[in-house]
Amino acid sequence: MIDLKNIVISGKEVCPIIEGGKGINGTDGRSSGHFAKEGCVGTISLVSADYYDENGNVVMERSHRLKRQERHEDLIAGAIKGGIAQARIAHEIAGNNGRIHVNELWELADSETVITEVLKGAKGLIHGVTCGAGLPYKLGEIASAQGVYYYPIVSSARAFQILWKRAYANYSEFLGGVVYEDPWLAGGHNGLSNAENPNEPQNPYNRIKELRATLNKLGLAEKPIIIAGGVWSLSDW
């Protein structure tokens, strides 16, 4: 058994084992609650999160309204209810142990609204927001307004530099860390620039090293890089 050293994540010292967001409803309040209960970090997927009726049954979200905009509004309202419901479940399981994060795909329609309203509706129950599938420029502003840490997902140092210069430099207090998702090894939402050849994969270690150097140069040496997207361990590289 490896003795992992605790680090500070989202304002609390925890074991640095972090549940992946898993896309569409792949992680929920139950899974994330148990991660946090053991002193780690759980991550609830906000994409199609379930909510329940008065009998505890999952509500199968359907809109019977006729206009497209109205149906869209109903689906967004359901997503917000689901995120809040799952955050409450996670908190009930975890108590005050670990940390509870949520994960959202930035390019989904009205993702800003979903994140904002879930954080408001589950005030104090969610400690961090992870977000990728695009460049989430407004994530720092949204999370900071609610006193919640944020964790952008990037695939290169250049991507983070763009986010930092355009927005995050103004919201550095609640930048909890950066998630690195490798553009060749990850399962989806991969970010390659036009200068990079998709058929010539680069060593992820060098890309992570460059990202670390960039964070250090920006005065963010204490911010952790969370490795995701199929990059398994340093010993592989």
Question: Positions of the model-derived regions?
Answer:
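Active-site entrance/lid segments in N-terminal catalytic domains of soluble metabolic enzymes
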Residues: 1-221
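Glycine-rich beta-strand-to-loop/alpha-helix junction loops that act as flexible
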Residues: 223-232
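Short, intrinsically disordered, charge-balanced linker/junction segments flanking boundaries
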Residues: 234-237
